Amino acid sequence: MHLTKQRGRQTEVKLGGLQKLTLLDYPGLVACTVFTVGCNMRCPFCHNALLVSKIEEENALDEGGFFAFLKKRQGILDGVCITGGEPTLQQDLPEFIAKIKALGFKVKLDTNGSFPDRIKSILETGNVDYVAMDIKNTLAKYPETVGIPGFDTSKIERSIKIIKESGIPYEFRTTAVSPLHEADDFEEIAKLIEGSQGYFIQGFKDSGELIRGEGLGELPEEELKRARDKARIIIPQTKIRGED
């Protein structure tokens, strides 16, 4: 893994992959998406399962190579999406983001909201232009949905508050998975993020590399629409990802 010398110490962000072009991940911008390695959650439906636990060193993305790529894309790409895994697990994420910003790119940060203090610190740097937080389920269903018995949902509530009050454009989103979600859950989820700028419901897609995919599937289209309509009771601008 490439190490960069900064402020008298070495910094390292573990990268697992790069999507060189996306027109979808960063709303309104032409961007690339970089994937960090490691996650504290074990959501059975995670479509990036290889990034959650470990990735073979020879398959990792070299940080130096990533920044060389960005320099070649200056004036072509508008932004960089940082996703995972869970990016806020990376100790040196603030420095990593600052280096991206120094090249003139806008930065979108994806997070599961597990580390509110880290999120607050990163957002306060002013280097993040857009943040997207996954709301996994209702608070009561969080432990089962993230694969961690006794998961502390107060951290999720704190992160929601921090993001809403940050002054930075943001969105909340939920991947709808059967049987973990039912349409009626989405009104309760919407109450959790009431007053938010935007809420997206995403249909589950089996990537073939799930953590534990047995018995999981998509919500039927009509059930997905009912979930959207339930959420719209609280957040009128709720959309299913991809719909007009």
PLM regions: where:
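A secondary-structure boundary/capping signal
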Residues: 35, 83-84, 111
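SEC14/CRAL-TRIO lipid-binding/transfer domains and related phosphoinositide-recognition modules
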Residues: 13-19, 38, 51-52, 65
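Conserved alpha-helical substructure of the radical SAM core
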Residues: 49-80
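Conserved AdoMet/S-adenosylmethionine-binding subsite of the radical SAM
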Residues: 67-79, 88-221
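Residues that line or immediately flank small-molecule/substrate-binding pockets and catalytic motifs
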Residues: 50, 84, 135, 203, ...
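Canonical Radical SAM [4Fe-4S] cluster-binding loop centered on the CxxxCxxC motif
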Residues: 28-61
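Auxiliary Fe-S-binding modules of radical SAM enzymes
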Residues: 2-28, 165, 178-244
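Conserved phosphate-binding and hydrolysis motifs of nucleotide-dependent enzymes
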Residues: 43, 84-85
